[in-house]
C-alpha cells in the first residue's frame, strides 16, 4: 500500500512544479525607482532601459527623477541609466515576494573618458577615442561663461575667431564669418556651423547669424578643429562647430533674462515635454542694445552714431516616436534682426524663415538611418554711404537687397560590425539661389540699377570606416563633391548716368573635389595617447564672393565671378594626457595646412578714393602652429582651464599682377599669431557661483599688404551668482572688466587710417530659472 502511494505523490509533486512554473512565468512585477546624482539631487530626463531575458523596455525619469515599469515580464534583470553629463550606470535587480522592485540609481559625473562627440565622425564616439582636436562645452559651462552672446562664448576656444575681431552685438552680419586655425582672411566662413546636423552658415554669403539658435536651447557645443571635408564637404575647410539642442523628455522649462548697460535687455528660454509618443519643444530669444560708437573719440564726427542692434528668434520642434527605436520630427525657425552700423545712413536688416524634417530610425542592434530635409527663404537689406573726410556729413551710395532661397537634404546609414568596427555612408545635396539687387547713387542722384546673382548646387557622397582594436583607433574616410554654378549674370540699367561695365551672362561652371582623411589614435596606457591625421579639404566660392560687391568705410571690395575653389592639404599630430585620477586633462596638437587658391581681399589700388580691393585667388598660403588645451578639476566645485594657440599663416606663393604689390611672405590678414585664454571657476549653487576669464589676442594685420596693423590686447570677464531656490538663480556678469579699448578694424582713408574700437566695459544683472533643477 505504501509503495502504491509513492507514484501518486510523485505525480502530484510534478504537477505542482509544472503549475507553479507556469504561474511564475505568467507573473509580472513592478519596477520603480528614482535617479539621483552623487550629491543626492534628482536627475530628470534620464534614459532608463530595462532588460529581462528577451524582454526590453525603456522610459525617461520625470521632473522628480522618478521612473516606473508597471508590468515587467520577468523576475530579474538589468537596468541601464544614462543622462547628459553623467557616466552610464548598470544595476541588476531581482523581484521580491511582493512582486515589486524599488531602485535608487546614483549617477556620477562623466569624465573626459566618457564624454561623447558626434561632430568628428558623424556618429557617436567617445571623446578619448576620437583622433583630432575636439573641444566640447556643456550647457553648464556655457552658463558659467560671463559672455552674453554665443560667439563670445566660443572665443574661449583657442583658434576660434570672427572676421575683424568683431562680435554679433554690433558687427554687420557680413563680418561674422568664422575661422579656425588661421585659414580665413576674408569674411566667408572657413568652418562649417551646424545645429543638430543641419547647416546654419549662410549659403549665399558664408557668414553666420549666431543668434538664430536660442542660447537656452543648447545642450552642448562641439568644436572640431581641422579639415573635415571628408564628411561635410564645402565650408568644413578648417573644422566643424555644432550646436546640439536639448531633447524633450519630462516637462521642463529653462529661462535666462538680464538687463545691462547701454540699455541692453535680453531674454532666452526653452521649454519641452513628452506625451505618449509625441514630444514638443519651443525656444525663443530676444535681444536689443543701444550699442556704442565704433570710431574712437579723436576721429569722430557728426555722422558717427552708436552701432546698435536688435534681434529675435523662435524655434518650434514637434516629434513622434516610430516604434521603440525611431523618431520623426519637424522644426520651424524664424529669425529677424536690424542693425545701425555706426552712421545714420548705414543700416542692415534680415528676415529669415526655415523649415526642416528629420527621421532617425534604428534597425536591430547594428543599423541606423538618418534622413534630413530643409528649406529656407531669406531677405537681406543693406545701405552703404560715403562719409566726408571730416566725418561731419555722408551721402547714400548704394541700396542693396539680397533675396536668397535654399533647399537641401541629407541621408546617412550607419552599420556596426561587432564591437570593433563601424561603417558610415551617406549623401547630401544643397542648392542656393541668390542675387544682389542694387540702386546706386552719386551725390544724392540715383544713377543706375544693378542685378547680379546666380545659382549654386553642391552634391556630395561620403563614406567612413572606424576601426577600434585594442589600443588602436583608425578612421579612414573620403568624400566626392560636385559643385555647379549656373544661371549667373550681371545686369546694369542706367537711370541718370552710364554703366561702368556692360551686362553679361556668365557661362555655367562645374568642378569636382575629392577629400580623403586618415586619422589614427594610439593609447599608450591609461594616461597617454597619441594621434595623427592627414587630410584634404576644399571650399567652393560663395555666390556673395562671385557676384556681390560691398563697401566698408572708404574701401570698396568688388566681386569676382571667376574664382576657383580653395584646396587644402593638411596634417596634424597630437598628444593627450589624463592623470591624477582623471582630474587633470591636457591636449597638445601641432598642425600644418597648405591652401591653394585661397580667396582673399586683394588690394588693387591703395591710392584711389575709395580704396579698391577685389576678391582673388591669392596663389598659396601656409598655416602652421600649435594648440594647447588643459583643465584641472581641483574639486567638485573648483575648476581651472587654459588654452593657447600659436598660428603662423603666411603667403608662400603669389604671382604678382602688373602694377600690383607682391604679397609673398606677408602674414594672412585677420589672423593673430598668439591667442591665450584661461578660466577659473568655483561653482557651488547653494553658496556662490563664481567665474573669471581672461583672453589675450596678439598682433595681426587688417589688410593683405600688412600696412594696417591691429595691436594686441587683453580682456577679462567676470560672473557671480547664487541660487535663491533650487529653481531660481540670480547673477551678475561683466565683460571687458578692465575696460580695454582695443582696435577691431584699421581701414585706409584718403587722409590715413580709420579705426574701429571694440566694446567698452559691459555689465548686466539677471535671473535664471531651471525647472526641474539642473545638476550644477
Where are these regions (language model features)?
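Signature of Gram-negative outer-membrane beta-barrel scaffolds
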Residues: 420-525
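Extracytoplasmic beta-strand/coil segments of soluble accessory domains associated
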Residues: 134, 151-202, 219
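Short, acidic, small-residue-rich periplasmic hinge/interaction motif at the N-terminus
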Residues: 36, 47, 51, 82-86, ...
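Gram-negative outer-membrane beta-barrel transporters
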Residues: 468-474, 482, 587, 591-595, ...
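Periplasmic-side early beta-strands and strand-to-turn transitions of outer-membrane beta-barrels
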Residues: 229-230, 242, 249-258, 270-351
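C-terminal beta-signal and adjacent terminal beta-strands/loops
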Residues: 292, 538, 594-596, 601, ...
Amino acid at each position: 500500500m505504501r509503495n502504491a502511494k509513492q507514484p501518486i505523490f510523485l505525480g502530484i509533486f510534478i504537477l505542482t512544479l509544472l503549475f507553479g512554473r507556469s504561474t511564475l512565468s505568467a507573473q509580472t512585477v513592478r519596477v520603480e525607482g528614482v535617479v539621483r546624482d552623487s550629491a543626492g539631487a534628482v536627475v530628470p530626463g534620464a534614459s532608463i532601459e530595462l532588460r529581462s531575458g528577451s524582454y526590453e523596455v525603456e522610459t525617461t525619469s520625470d521632473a522628480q527623477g522618478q521612473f516606473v515599469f508597471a508590468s515587467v515580464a520577468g523576475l530579474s534583470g538589468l537596468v541601464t541609466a544614462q543622462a547628459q553629463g553623467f557616466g552610464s550606470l548598470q544595476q541588476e535587480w531581482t523581484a521580491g515576494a511582493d512582486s515589486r522592485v524599488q531602485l535608487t540609481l546614483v549617477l556620477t559625473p562623466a569624465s573626459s573618458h566618457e564624454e561623447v562627440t558626434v561632430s568628428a565622425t558623424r556618429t557617436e564616439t567617445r571623446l578619448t577615442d576620437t583622433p583630432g582636436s575636439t573641444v566640447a562645452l556643456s550647457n553648464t559651462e556655457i552658463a558659467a561663461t560671463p559672455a552674453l552672446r554665443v560667439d563670445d562664448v566660443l572665443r574661449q576656444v583657442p583658434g576660434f575667431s570672427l572676421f575683424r575681431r568683431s562680435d554679433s552685438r554690433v558687427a554687420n552680419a557680413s563680418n561674422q564669418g568664422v575661422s579656425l586655425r588661421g585659414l580665413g582672411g576674408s569674411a566667408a566662413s572657413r568652418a562649417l556651423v551646424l545645429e543638430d546636423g543641419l547647416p546654419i552658415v549662410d549659403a549665399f554669403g558664408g557668414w553666420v547669424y549666431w543668434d538664430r539658435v536660442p542660447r537656452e536651447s543648447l545642450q552642448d557645443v562641439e568644436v572640431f578643429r581641422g579639415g573635415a571635408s571628408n564628411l561635410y564637404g564645402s565650408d568644413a575647410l578648417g573644422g566643424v562647430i555644432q550646436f546640439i539642442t536639448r531633447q524633450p523628455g519630462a516637462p521642463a522649462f529653462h529661462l535666462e533674462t538680464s538687463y545691462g548697460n547701454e540699455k541692453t535687455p535680453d531674454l532666452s528660454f526653452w521649454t519641452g515635454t513628452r506625451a505618449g509618443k509625441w514630444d514638443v519643444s519651443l525656444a525663443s530669444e530676444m535681444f536689443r542694445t543701444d550699442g556704442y560708437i565704433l570710431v574712437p573719440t579723436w576721429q569722430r564726427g557728426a555722422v558717427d552714431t552708436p552701432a546698435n542692434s536688435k534681434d529675435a528668434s523662435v524655434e518650434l520642434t514637434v516629434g513622434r516616436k516610430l516604434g521603440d527605436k525611431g523618431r520623426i520630427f519637424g522644426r520651424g525657425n524664424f529669425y529677424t534682426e536690424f542693425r545701425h552700423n555706426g552712421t545714420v545712413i548705414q543700416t542692415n536688416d534680415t528676415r529669415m524663415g526655415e523649415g526642416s524634417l528629420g527621421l532617425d530610425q534604428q534597425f536591430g542592434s547594428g543599423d541606423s538611418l538618418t534622413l534630413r530635409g530643409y528649406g529656407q527663404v531669406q531677405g537681406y537689406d543693406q545701405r552703404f554711404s560715403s562719409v566726408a573726410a571730416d566725418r561731419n556729413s555722408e551721402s547714400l551710395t548704394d541700396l542693396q537687397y539680397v533675396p536668397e532661397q535654399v533647399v537641401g537634404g541629407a541621408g546617412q546609414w550607419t552599420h556596426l560590425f561587432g564591437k570593433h568596427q563601424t561603417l558610415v555612408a551617406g549623401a547630401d545635396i544643397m542648392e542656393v539661389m541668390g542675387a544682389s539687387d542694387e540702386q546706386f547713387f552719386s551725390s544724392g542722384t540715383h544713377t543706375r540699377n544693378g542685378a547680379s546673382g546666380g545659382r549654386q548646387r553642391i552634391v556630395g557622397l561620403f563614406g567612413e570606416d572606424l576601426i577600434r582594436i585594442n589600443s588602436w583607433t583608425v578612421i579612414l574616410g573620403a568624400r566626392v563633391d560636385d559643385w555647379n554654378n549656373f544661371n549667373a549674370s550681371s545686369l546694369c540699367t542706367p537711370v541718370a548716368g552710364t554703366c561702368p561695365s556692360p551686362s553679361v551672362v556668365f557661362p555655367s561652371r562645374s568642378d569636382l573635389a575629392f577629400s580623403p582623411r586618415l586619422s589614427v589614435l594610439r593609447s599608450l596606457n591609461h594616461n597617454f595617447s597619441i594621434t595623427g591625421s592627414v587630410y584634404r579639404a576644399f571650399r567652393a566660392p560663395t555666390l556673395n564672393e562671385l557676384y556681390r560687391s560691398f563697401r566698408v568705410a572708404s574701401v570698396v571690395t568688388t566681386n569676382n565671378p571667376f574664382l576657383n575653389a580653395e584646396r587644402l592639404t593638411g596634417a596634424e599630430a597630437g598628444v593627450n594626457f589624463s592623470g591624477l585620477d582623471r582630474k587633470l586633462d591636457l591636449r597638445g596638437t601641432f598642425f600644418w595646412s597648405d591652401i591653394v587658391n585661397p580667396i582673399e581681399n586683394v588690394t588693387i589700388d591703395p591710392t584711389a578714393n575709395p580704396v579698391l580691393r577685389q576678391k582673388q585667388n591669392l596663389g598659396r598660403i601656409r598655416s602652421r602652429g600649435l594648440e594647447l588645451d588643459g583643465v584641472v578639476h581641483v574639486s567638485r566645485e573648483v575648476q581651472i582651464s587654459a588654452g593657447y594657440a600659436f598660428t603662423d599663416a603666411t603667403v608662400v606663393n603669389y604671382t604678382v599682377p602688373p602694377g600690383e604689390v607682391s604679397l609673398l611672405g606677408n602674414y594672412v590678414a585677420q589672423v593673430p599669431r598668439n591667442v591665450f585664454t584661461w578660466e577659473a571657476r568655483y561653482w557651488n549653487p547653494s553658496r556662490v557661483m563664481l567665474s573669471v576669464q581672461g583672453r589675450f589676442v596678439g598682433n595681426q594685420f587688417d589688410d593683405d599688404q600688412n600696412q594696417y596693423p591691429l595691436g594686441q590686447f587683453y580682456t577679462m570677464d567676470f560672473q557671480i551668482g547664487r541660487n535663491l531656490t533650487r529653481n531660481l538663480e540670480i547673477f551678475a556678469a561683466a565683460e571687458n572688466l578692465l575696460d580695454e579699448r582695443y582696435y577691431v578694424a584699421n581701414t585706409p582713408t584718403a587722409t590715413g587710417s580709420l579705426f574701429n574700437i571694440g566694446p567698452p566695459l559691459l555689465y548686466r544683472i539677471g535671473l535664471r530659472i531651471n525647472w526641474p533643477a539642473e545638476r550644477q
